Amino acid sequence: MNDATATRLDGKALAKQIETELSQRVAAVIKKTGRTPILATILVGDDPASATYVRMKGNACKRVGMESIRVEMPASTTTEQLLAKIDELNNNPDVHGILLQHPVPEQIDERACFDAIDLNKDVDGVTSLGFGRMSMGEPAYGSCTPQGIMYLLERYFLKNGIEFAGKNAVVVGRSAILGKPMAQMLLNANCTVTICHSKTQNLEEHVGRADILVGAVGVPELIKKDWIKPGAIVVDAGFHPTEDGGVGDIELKGIESIAAAYTPVPGGVGPMTINTLIRQTVEAAEKAAQA
């Protein structure tokens, strides 16, 4: 491809555009029900990074006219105490979405607590039941980062007359909240999907076959740009702070002359993650309003 031809998939700009749409949908819910959509965020312990993420999610709620209830619990919290709090929120009709901020202190059974969240309020897409339903093509809220990536790609594909069907998609990474659901979503969209991970042999060969490449492995610039097929659509879900700002899991410097489209780091996938959480909470509120 010629130099500097790739489309920059600007997640920050799209998230801002979607927030305008969500504000209108929130206003419609309030007008219909007299109740403001509410996201409950549970923060266990005092991890500063987690507190920052929760604050960012609360700010995103405010921007679209939603409310955010912040539930703070001490680091000494037990699994039973956290399960009781989740049950309380499950049974509160004013709460439309529940987010348990990861990670929780090591004495807590995180999976049991995730799975205790009501499926209708699992707007972060963390329950095993929700993942199973999504895998079977049944309605469920997807894990926010891969769902945000799909939305970003759908907008780009629709604008450019591209279809997912038949594309070779390669996902590098197999985490429960990113790699696995990402692969399943691409499969649901009729892509031919390959999942690569730390035990994969000949990673370069797999990457080189990708029409759609998703880097979700958590290793700085593990995937080299010269492995990438010309004309591929490149999605980098990684972020690793550096003195210059940060890098992802894919070597992006010079990617403009190789890829058809790519997500920048930062400003690509990250903004879509929180945006998807808010969008799915609005959807939950809309469904509750129709019940």
Curated annotation (Swiss-Prot):
Looking at the Swiss-Prot or TrEMBL record, what is one Pfam family this protein matches? Answer: THF_DHG_CYH
Listed under catalytic activity are: (6R)-5,10-methylene-5,6,7,8-tetrahydrofolate + NADP(+) = (6R)-5,10-methenyltetrahydrofolate + NADPH; (6R)-5,10-methenyltetrahydrofolate + H2O = (6R)-10-formyltetrahydrofolate + H(+)
Q: Which GO terms describe its cellular component?
A: cytosol
**InterPro entries given in the database record:** Aminoacid_DH-like_N_sf (IPR046346), NAD(P)-bd_dom_sf (IPR036291), THF_DH/CycHdrlase (IPR000672), THF_DH/CycHdrlase_cat_dom (IPR020630), THF_DH/CycHdrlase_CS (IPR020867), THF_DH/CycHdrlase_NAD-bd_dom (IPR020631)
| Record's keyword terms, sorted | Amino-acid biosynthesis, Histidine biosynthesis, Hydrolase, Methionine biosynthesis, Multifunctional enzyme, NADP, One-carbon metabolism, Oxidoreductase, Purine biosynthesis
Q: Which domain of life is it from?
A: Bacteria
Output one GO MF annotation: methenyltetrahydrofolate cyclohydrolase activity
Biological process GO annotation list? L-histidine biosynthetic process; methionine biosynthetic process; purine nucleotide biosynthetic process; tetrahydrofolate interconversion
Involved pathway(s): One-carbon metabolism; tetrahydrofolate interconversion
Q: Which PANTHER family match?
A: C-1-TETRAHYDROFOLATE SYNTHASE, CYTOPLASMIC (PTHR48099:SF5), C-1-TETRAHYDROFOLATE SYNTHASE, CYTOPLASMIC-RELATED (PTHR48099)
Instruction: Describe the protein's quaternary organization and the partners it interacts with.
Output: Homodimer.
Identification of the protein by name = Bifunctional protein FolD
Organism whose genome encodes this protein: Psychrobacter sp. (strain PRwf-1)
